[in-house]
UniProtKB/Swiss-Prot annotation:
Biological role stated in the UniProt entry: Specifically methylates the cytosine at position 967 (m5C967) of 16S rRNA.
Gene Ontology biological-process entries: regulation of DNA-templated transcription; RNA methylation; rRNA processing
Source organism superkingdom: Bacteria
Protein name per its UniProtKB record: Ribosomal RNA small subunit methyltransferase B
A Gene Ontology molecular function term of the record: RNA binding
Residues annotated to bind S-adenosyl-L-methionine: C221, G222, G223, A224, G225, L226, K227, D242, D268, D283
Subcellular localization: Cytoplasm
Species, as recorded: Thermus thermophilus (strain ATCC 27634 / DSM 579 / HB8)
Keyword Cytoplasm assigned: yes
Keyword annotations of the record: Cytoplasm, Methyltransferase, RNA-binding, rRNA processing, S-adenosyl-L-methionine, Transferase
One cellular component (GO) term of this entry: cytoplasm
Length: 398
């Protein structure tokens, strides 16, 4: 994917997102091939993420001016949305309209006049809250019913700060969790600096285990092992299980560069693991609604059935985690989503089946949306939305 300007690159990336691609991967790959100054790279990033985070609102603003938007070529629809995004951000007409008209001329010359007319006629328009937040109606209403309001979702439409977990001494601005820092420069070879990009809410899931030197810890659904890295840095003997061998191999390479040792084992975790431990972390696969800031396209790909479907899998995985937890041990369940079904719903169903487990208090060092058997993290301020539950096995009842 090659493009001559940040605007052209943004359109190209968004077209690939339309085809099912992931914005973060596509944009990172495109920027690696573009020898632009940081200002241009930052502007392309703003355009891609801004358009996806505000997509429903942008279409709402354009709707009175486009009676049949679905009849337009996808390139032109994205050009109009990106022009509307710049209008929404207060960019003046003289700096905003002409560049997008030129983009249209290069692709569809016959539609350049339409682009010019529409972008010059944009005007404020009241929008329902779910549209203003660019959330699907079904999820917006579910969150309103569960949390009481959806104001927290504005956090998903803010710029995403880059947090790193440090595995050596650094001179960076501290994040909200000890060991987490804010990275304010361009992306780089982080592991060479002893750093690992990781949201503080993700790091806190590993901290909940309170792993000590020499303790054996099982990291289930560990992926590349980001949480395992932190546990290993505490001196724990970490065994990280996942079904994706390729991600594990990439994680093992990163761990070596960070000077850490993690044992990786590849297995389907709907089946029991062949060992037990006093400390078990299950960071289960989920709908990912807490990561809408970093993965804004995800909100438009989920269906109302997805939370219940994922909850059924998560309950299966919790059964595996329970069998692997020794008496007196701790099982931490975490998901990077804010749905009732995948958080409180899963833990409630699990505890009904397993009276040998008791929930323990969880006190994150950042604001929470709701408390119950576990806690939901407020995604404002750069945090990912997470749910955590800390479960103690008080006896060996099966």
């Amino acid at each position: 994917m090659r493009a001559g300007t940040p605007r052209a690159l943004a359109v190209a990336v968004l077209l690939e997102v339309d085809r099912g691609g992931r914005a973060q991967l596509l944009l990172d790959r495109a920027l690696r091939r573009s020898p632009w100054p940081e200002r241009d790279r930052a502007y392309a990033t703003f355009l891609v993420y801004g358009a996806l985070r505000r997509l429903r609102l942008l279409d709402h603003l354009l709707a009175p001016l486009l009676p049949r938007p679905e009849g337009l070529p996808p390139e032109v629809r994205w050009i109009l949305r990106l022009g509307a995004l710049e209008w929404l951000e207060g960019k003046p007409d003289h700096a905003r309209v002409s560049p997008w008209v030129e983009e249209a001329k290069r692709r569809y010359p016959g539609l350049a006049g339409l682009v010019n007319a529409v972008l010059r006629r944009l005007a404020p328009r009241e929008a329902p809250e779910c549209v203003r937040l660019s959330l699907p109606d079904w999820l917006c209403e579910a969150w309103r019913g569960f949390f009481g309001d959806v104001a927290f979702a504005e956090g998903f439409n803010e710029p995403a700060p880059l947090f790193v977990t440090a595995y050596r001494e650094v001179d960076l601005r501290p994040g909200p969790v000890p060991g987490s820092y804010l990275w304010e420069g361009p992306k780089t070879d982080f592991s060479a600096l002893g750093l690992q990009p990781q949201n503080p809410a993700s790091l806190f899931a590993a901290k909940l285990l309170e792993a000590r030197p020499g303790e054996r810890v099982l990291d289930l659904c560990g992926g590349a092992g980001l949480k395992a890295f932190y546990l290993a840095a505490q001196g724990a003997e970490v065994v990280s299980y996942d079904l994706n061998r390729r991600r594990q191999e990439a994680g093992a390479r990163t761990a070596r560069r960070l000077g850490l040792w993690v044992h990786y084992r590849t297995q389907d975790l709907t089946r029991p693991v062949p060992e037990r431990a006093k400390k078990v972390l299950l960071d289960a696969p989920c709908t990912g609604t807490g990561t809408f800031r970093a993965h804004p396209e995800l909100r438009y790909r989920l269906s109302p059935e997805d939370p219940a479907r994922m909850a059924a899998l998560q309950l299966q995985l919790l059964e595996t985690a329970a069998q692997a937890t020794e008496e007196g041990g701790v099982l931490v369940y975490s998901v990077c989503t804010l749905t009732e079904e995948e958080g409180e719903g899963v833990v409630r169903a699990f505890l009904a089946r397993h009276p040998e487990f008791r929930p323990e208090p969880v006190q994150p060092p950042f604001p929470v949306l709701a408390r119950g058997l576990g806690v939901y993290v407020d995604p404002r301020g750069g945090l990912d939305g997470f749910y955590y539950a800390k479960l103690r096995r008080v006896n060996s009842q099966a």
